[in-house]
């Protein structure tokens, strides 16, 4: 499962989604986690209500199931959720490695319902039909 982190320093969740310089992306499973990429953003990143800066960030995280942020605006959160990504706001800057370790431990046990749903993001839905349903007798 891919997880995205809004960060200014690549080691902590410490950035507002809209003005994050970097989105760090990791793959996490019950067996471990692996750094995949850091997507850098330049240009105007001020917290100014300019929604145009969100497009490239949403594109960068489109395959992620969860996004960790220090803060996120209402419209940004709505766009993240509409992309089937679960945003999580940290109360204070937190080390990405610490979050990954906690997430890995939860995945190894019994994940809460919201996390089980997030884990299904990239899984194709299995559709099965009983033979009886296919008969139009």
Residue ranges of predicted features:
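Mid-chain, well-packed structural core segment of small domains
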Residues: 59-92
């Amino acid at each position: 499962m891919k997880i995205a982190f809004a960060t200014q320093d690549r080691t902590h969740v410490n950035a507002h989604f809209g003005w994050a310089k970097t989105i760090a992306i990791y793959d996490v499973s019950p067996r471990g986690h692996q750094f995949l990429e850091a997507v850098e953003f330049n240009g105007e990143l001020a917290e100014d209500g300019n929604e145009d800066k969100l497009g490239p960030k949403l594109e960068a995280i489109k395959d992620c199931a969860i996004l960790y942020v220090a803060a996120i605006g209402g419209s940004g959160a709505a766009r993240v959720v509409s992309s089937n990504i679960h945003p999580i706001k940290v109360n204070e800057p937190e080390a990405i490695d610490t979050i990954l370790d906690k997430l890995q431990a939860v995945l190894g046990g019994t994940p809460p319902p919201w996390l089980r749903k997030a884990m299904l993001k990239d899984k194709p839905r299995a559709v099965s039909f009983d033979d009886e349903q296919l008969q139009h007798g």
